[in-house]
Design a protein with these regions (language model features):
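Non-catalytic positions within long, well-ordered alpha-helices that form the structural scaffold/packing
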Residues: 82-83, 106, 144-147
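Hinge/beta->alpha junction and helix N-cap segments in small-molecule ligand-binding domains
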Residues: 34-47, 65-74, 128-138, 154-175, ...
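Periplasmic-binding protein-like
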Residues: 86-94, 152-154, 186-187
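Short, well-structured alpha-helical segments in soluble
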Residues: 73-87
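N-terminal helix-turn-helix DNA-binding module of bacterial transcription factors
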Residues: 1-25
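Short beta-strand segments enriched in small/hydrophobic residues
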Residues: 22-40, 142, 150-156
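Flexible loop/hinge segments that line or gate small-molecule binding clefts
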Residues: 93-135, 180
Length: 192
């Protein structure tokens, strides 16, 4: 098994693709999901996954949804996993910047798209997300127009890039509206 892993790692470093991956009729993507419920319509991740699968289906892509744990990420390198399983690319949902595989994406040659995260300086890795500044400012403006002057902010985990961005957007919008930010009312959570 150790030799097999070494061969796969070497193949990845050399840019190898299987013959099956090169065929146009065999188009396979994976959606890695972490820290998010997605199996029923009321779950936050349900619509994200459904939209991705529907869009991929229109262009004849097969999509596998793969729940990921920290142990799963430690068991195998991202590039090796992708090559071994014949995936042409991946979509990452619910990951944070301290995840093992996100760190490996800094050097990957296998296309990846991140939802609400960002890896700089790798042309093979893109991201999509929300406009935190506009969204949070619209919410603050709405509350301000309703007469609220003491506004709380419940954020995601403190180690998340997107949470830091949203926190800054909250501070900026509060300042724009001449409102005081009360630190005890602007807190981080962990989505549980």
């Amino acid at each position: 098994e150790e030799l097999r892993q070494l061969v796969l790692d070497t193949a990845v470093e050399m840019g190898y693709q299987t013959k099956k991956m090169k065929k146009e009729e065999f188009k396979k993507l994976c959606l890695f999901i972490k820290n998010m419920d997605y199996e029923s319509p009321e779950d936050f991740g349900y619509d994200i996954i459904l939209g991705f699968k529907q869009s991929a289906f229109r262009d004849n892509w097969n999509v596998d949804v793969i729940p990921v744990t920290p142990d799963f990420q430690l068991s195998e390198k991202y590039d090796t996993y992708m090559l071994k399983n014949g995936y042409s690319g991946a979509f990452f949902v619910g990951f944070s910047l301290h995840d093992t595989w996100l760190d490996q994406l800094r050097d990957t040659k296998i296309p990846a798209v991140l939802f609400d995260n960002y890896i700089p300086n790798n042309p093979h890795v893109s991201y999509i997300g929300t406009d935190n500044d506009e969204g949070i400012d619209a919410a603050i403006e709405h509350l301000y127009q309703l007469g609220h002057r003491k506004i709380a902010f419940l954020n995601g985990p403190s180690y998340s890039m997107i949470s830091k961005s949203r926190h800054q957007a909250f501070i900026d919008s509060m300042e724009k509206h001449d409102l005081i930010v009360h630190p005890e009312l602007a807190v981080y959570g962990d989505f549980s």
